[in-house]
């Protein structure tokens, strides 16, 4: 079966940031149902977050639905995991039955990838600082530290990678063995993310940039 782990993870992360969450549940897999959900969400929320449906498949309705109800300002980012990320705005229609959106009135929209780790990582990197800025907080960037690698990473991606890592007993960083974007265990058991530049090979003893989950979830 398919389990909607994103729903529970995102709810918990948002509440941790002090947000009031309006959970609209699972939207039926059609463009019109997605548009209706966006219209409903825009009337009651400052920020709309979706998980999945922002890629280019035949059943990925979120992007065209947002474009129909507002606009997409950003689509796709060159990171791994998490490339199919979208940011846009959804117009508010005002009084019930109004056909046109109210000029200048909108809810922000962030579309996250559907894979659990991708959704988790992009939430920490993009949604968290965005929400903090909406709350009036200026210092929103997590503080990274430099630590020493206890592993070899010899097949880097062309994109900027965020590798799930664990602290080793000797003080170095170890790599979580399964880096797949569907393996949410790596976020539960891991201690943070290594921010690795595009194409960068990592050898044991190299200095790496580390973002701890304690910092990212603070």
Please give the residue ranges for each predicted region.
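Secondary-structure boundary/capping motif
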Residues: 6, 33, 57-58, 118-119, ...
């Amino acid at each position: 079966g398919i389990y909607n782990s994103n729903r529970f993870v995102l709810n918990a992360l948002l509440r941790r940031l002090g947000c009031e969450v309006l959970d609209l549940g699972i939207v039926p897999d059609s463009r019109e149902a997605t548009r209706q959900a966006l219209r409903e969400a825009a009337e009651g929320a400052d920020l709309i977050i979706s998980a999945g449906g922002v890629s280019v498949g035949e059943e990925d309705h979120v992007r065209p639905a947002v474009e129909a109800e507002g606009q997409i300002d950003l689509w796709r980012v060159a990171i791994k995991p998490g490339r199919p990320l979208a940011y846009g705005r959804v117009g508010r229609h005002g009084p019930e039955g109004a056909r046109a959106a109210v000029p200048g009135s909108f809810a922000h929209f962030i579309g996250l990838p559907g894979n659990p780790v991708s959704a988790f990582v992009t939430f920490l990197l993009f949604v968290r600082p965005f929400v903090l800025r909406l709350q009036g907080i200026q210092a929103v960037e997590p503080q990274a530290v430099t630590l020493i690698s206890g592993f070899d990473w010899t097949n880097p991606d062309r994109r900027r990678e965020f590798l799930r890592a664990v602290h080793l007993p000797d003080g170095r960083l170890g790599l979580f063995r399964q880096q797949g974007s569907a393996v949410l265990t790596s976020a539960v058991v891991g201690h943070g993310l290594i921010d690795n530049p595009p194409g960068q090979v990592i050898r044991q003893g190299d200095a790496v940039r580390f973002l701890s989950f304690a910092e990212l979830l603070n």
